[in-house]
Structures are given as C-alpha cells and as structure tokens.
Amino acid sequence: MALDVNAIVDQLKESSILELNDLVKAIEEEFGVSAAAPVAAAGAAGADAAAEKDSFTVELSEIGQEKVKVIKAVREITGLGLKDAKGLVDNAPSALKEDVSKDEAEEMKAKLEEVGAVVNLK
C-alpha cells in the first residue's frame, strides 16, 4: 500500500478545523504521542540567568548608628539633594539605585557599609 502524500495534503486542506482536531486526537490516542510542543529545560535556564545577573538594585536595608554619615554617602552615591537623600534613609529599607552594573553596585555597597549601613544587592 503506497501513500499518496499529495492526496492526503489535499484532503487536509479541505477539512474543517473540527475534523482536523479530531484527527489529531485520534493520532495521539493511536500512537501514544502528544501534539503539545516540547518544553525546554526552563529550570536550568532560569538558574543560569540568575547566576549571570548583570544589573542590580542597591537597597538600603538598615541605616545603623551613623545616620548623618549614611545620608552623606547616599547623597554622594545618588547625586540627590539633602532632603531627598534624608527621605531615602528615613524610609529604609529603600532602593537607592536600580539597574546598575555589578562593579558599581559593589562599590556603592562598600561605601555604605563603611559608614555602618546594611545594604542588599538584588
């Protein structure tokens, strides 16, 4: 029994969506397969993306004992005025800068920790 591929394709072209859906279900049942697209290993890709993170948010978690020094450091890092910098410090935990490089984030963290603040990089 030879297959006439062109005849099958022509017959599929003339079929309705419901008929084609029934055909897919019948093929799935008969051959034990699924028409669903295979899903790539998303868990592994997600872990790689987290390990290779290239932009960070610098978050001031706690201000410590030296509030004035922390405010000065925040002003230096962010370029904000005294009132805005004080507002960020008073409302800790707060995000100081977003989408910064790893090196820049580490530098900011070091400056703030030097004056007694607790900083998280996210």
Swiss-Prot record:
Pfam families: Ribosomal_L12, Ribosomal_L12_N. GO terms for cellular component: cytosolic large ribosomal subunit. Coiled coil: none annotated. The keyword Ligase does not apply. GO terms for molecular function: mRNA binding; structural constituent of ribosome. Keywords: Ribonucleoprotein, Ribosomal protein. This is Large ribosomal subunit protein bL12. It comes from Latilactobacillus sakei subsp. sakei (strain 23K) (Lactobacillus sakei subsp. sakei). The gene is rplL.
